[in-house]
C-alpha cells in the first residue's frame, strides 16, 4: 500500500503514518536483513578506507567502526572506516587475524574500500578491535623487502626488469627479463646479504607529480593518481603498494634457492628472513645425518659419496 492511497487525512499525516510503518518494518526484521539494507544504501559512494598499514607498517592492533556487513558464501564481508589489515595485492598475500572476535579469512580492496571476509557478523556502527597476525605480517614484510633488494641489484648490475613477483606459502618467485647464470646469481645473493648487514633504512614517500617526473624508479606498469615510492637503502627505488620492514637488517638473510629459464628470462626462487633460517636448519640437519652415515666431516660428504660411487 502506498501512503498516497489513504483517504481522510492530510498529506503530512499520510507521510508521517508511512514513516511510522516503515520504521516498524525496519526494527522487526532480522539483524542480517538490516545489514543488507544498510549495504544497499551505502554501496554507492562509500568512502575509501583509511589504510593504517600505510601509516604504520608495525601497527598490529587497532579499533575501527563497522560500516557494513553482508553475508557471503557462509561468511561475512565487512568494511570499516579504517583498517590495519593489508589486502592481497602487488604479489603479496593478505593479512590474517581477528576482527571483533571473528576470524579474518581474507582481505581484498575494491575501489579504495578494504573488504574483510570474516567468520561471524559484526554490527554496523559498532566499534570493534582488530588484531593482525604479527608473525604472518613480519614474514610478508621480510619477503617483500628482500625481493626489492634482489630486484634492485639485478636491475643495477644487468639492466633486467622484475616482470613478475609472488609470495607463496613456501617460497618467493621473482621473474627477471633476461638470463642469469649460477655464478651471477651467487654474486647477487652475496650483494643482497651485504645490503642487509649494512642495516640501511627503508623509506616510503608519496611524491608530488612534479617530483615523480624527475624520479628514476622501477614500475611494472603505467601508474596514475598518487604513487607510493619505496626506497630500499641505495639499491632500489620502486613504486609499490606492499608492506615493508623499517630497516634492511630486519630482513635477516636472503637465500636464492633455485633458478630456471622462463619466458626468455629467469625465474628465481628465494627465501628471506625466518624462511631462509628454517630452510638452513632443515638442510643442515640432513647434512649432519649424511655426515654421520658416511663417517665424514659435514663439509666433506660429497667427496665421501664420490669415493663410494668409485668403488
Predicted regions and their residues:
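Acidic/proline-rich low-complexity IDRs
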Residues: 14-22, 36, 51, 66
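Acidic, Ala/Val/Gly-enriched low-complexity intrinsically disordered segments
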Residues: 9-16, 20, 27, 40-43
Amino acid at each position: 500500500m502506498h501512503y498516497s492511497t489513504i483517504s481522510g487525512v492530510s498529506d503530512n499525516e499520510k507521510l508521517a503514518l508511512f514513516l511510522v510503518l516503515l520504521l516498524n518494518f525496519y526494527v522487526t526484521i532480522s539483524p542480517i536483513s538490516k545489514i543488507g539494507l544498510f549495504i544497499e544504501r551505502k554501496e554507492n559512494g562509500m568512502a575509501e578506507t583509511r589504510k593504517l598499514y600505510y601509516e604504520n607498517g608495525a601497527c598490529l592492533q587497532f579499533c575501527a567502526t563497522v560500516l557494513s556487513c553482508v553475508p557471503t558464501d557462509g561468511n561475512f564481508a565487512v568494511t570499516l572506516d579504517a583498517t590495519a589489515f593489508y589486502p592481497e595485492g602487488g604479489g603479496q598475500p593478505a593479512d590474517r587475524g581477528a576482527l571483533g572476535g571473528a576470524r579474518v579469512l581474507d582481505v581484498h580492496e575494491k575501489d579504495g574500500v578494504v573488504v574483510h571476509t570474516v567468520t561471524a557478523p559484526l554490527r554496523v556502527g559498532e566499534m570493534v578491535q582488530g588484531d593482525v597476525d604479527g608473525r604472518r605480517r613480519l614474514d610478508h614484510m621480510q619477503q617483500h623487502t628482500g625481493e626489492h633488494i634482489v630486484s634492485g641489484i639485478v636491475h643495477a648490475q644487468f639492466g633486467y626488469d622484475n616482470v613478475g613477483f609472488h609470495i607463496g606459502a613456501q617460497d618467493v618467485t621473482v621473474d627477471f627479463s633476461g638470463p642469469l647464470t649460477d655464478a651471477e646469481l651467487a654474486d647477487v645473493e652475496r650483494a643482497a646479504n651485504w645490503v642487509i648487514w649494512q642495516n640501511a633504512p627503508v623509506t616510503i614517500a608519496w611524491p608530488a607529480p612534479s617530483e615523480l617526473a624527475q624520479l628514476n624508479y622501477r614500475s611494472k606498469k603505467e601508474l596514475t593518481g598518487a604513487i607510493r615510492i619505496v626506497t630500499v637503502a641505495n639499491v632500489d627505488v620502486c613504486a609499490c603498494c606492499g608492506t615493508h620492514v623499517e630497516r634492511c637488517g630486519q630482513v635477516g638473510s636472503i637465500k636464492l634457492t633455485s633458478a630456471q629459464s622462463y619466458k626468455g628470462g629467469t625465474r628465481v626462487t628465494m627465501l628471506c628472513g625466518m624462511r631462509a633460517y628454517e630452510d638452513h636448519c632443515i638442510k643442515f640437519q640432513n647434512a649432519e645425518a649424511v655426515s654421520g652415515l658416511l663417517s665424514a666431516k659435514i663439509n666433506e660428504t660429497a667427496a665421501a659419496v664420490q669415493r663410494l660411487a668409485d668403488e
